[in-house]
């Protein structure tokens, strides 16, 4: 007889909290929240806990965009519960720290940044790389800030280290900057017609 497949046991509330505070480094994020106001509509941070989400709501923030994806992990489960309890709208886009995403994901990111209730908070795990890219695109594409200025959102001040593997995002931004300077093409049109994450990743460390 073929044995029935066994289901992985669901994590207990205690296990979820342990994974959240220890494995996901939530305890460290309490000390270094990496929380900044970008403009009247957007704030950035590392992965927020219930207390910081409550503070954000009390400041008028209405929605939260997680760049970690909607996965059944401890930090996502904790965040879902907190946002539901606080009345914050929570949405997800999955970006990666050390590799470039497909163009459809970048367009989805911009769509969420456009349509989510404002003011909004955007975050990843550390608030450095994925969040820095999201803020860069928000400022350049949605607010018309020149790219060279918008890229300041990717800075060591926010714990972004461009010489690390996370610096691969600059290959994409450099390629777009060259095309934009030459032809005047906008970022979204460039993503639809010319962006190739595979080619841009070749030779990356």
Where are these regions (language model features)?
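Cys-dependent protein tyrosine phosphatase-like superfamily
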Residues: 1-120, 133-205
């Amino acid at each position: 007889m073929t044995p029935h497949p066994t289901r992985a046991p669901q994590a207990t509330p205690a296990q979820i909290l342990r994974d959240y505070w220890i494995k996901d480094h939530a305890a460290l994020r309490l000390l270094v929240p990496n929380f900044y106001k970008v403009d009247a509509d957007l704030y950035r941070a590392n992965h927020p806990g219930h207390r910081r989400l409550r503070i954000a709501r009390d400041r008028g923030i209405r929605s939260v965009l997680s760049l970690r994806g909607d996965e059944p992990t401890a930090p996502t489960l904790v965040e879902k519960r907190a946002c539901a309890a606080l009345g914050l709208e929570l949405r997800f886009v999955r970006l990666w720290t050390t590799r470039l995403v497909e163009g459809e994901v970048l367009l989805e990111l911009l769509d969420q940044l456009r349509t989510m209730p404002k003011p909004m908070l955007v975050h990843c795990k550390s608030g450095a790389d994925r969040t820095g890219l999201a803020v860069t695109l928000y400022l350049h594409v949605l607010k018309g800030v020149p790219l060279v200025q918008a890229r300041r959102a990717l800075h060591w001040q926010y714990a972004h280290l461009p010489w690390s593997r996370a610096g691969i995002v600059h290959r994409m931004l450099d390629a777009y900057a060259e095309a934009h300077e030459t032809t005047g093409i906008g970022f979204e049109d460039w993503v639809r017609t010319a962006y190739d994450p595979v080619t841009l990743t070749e030779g990356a460390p």
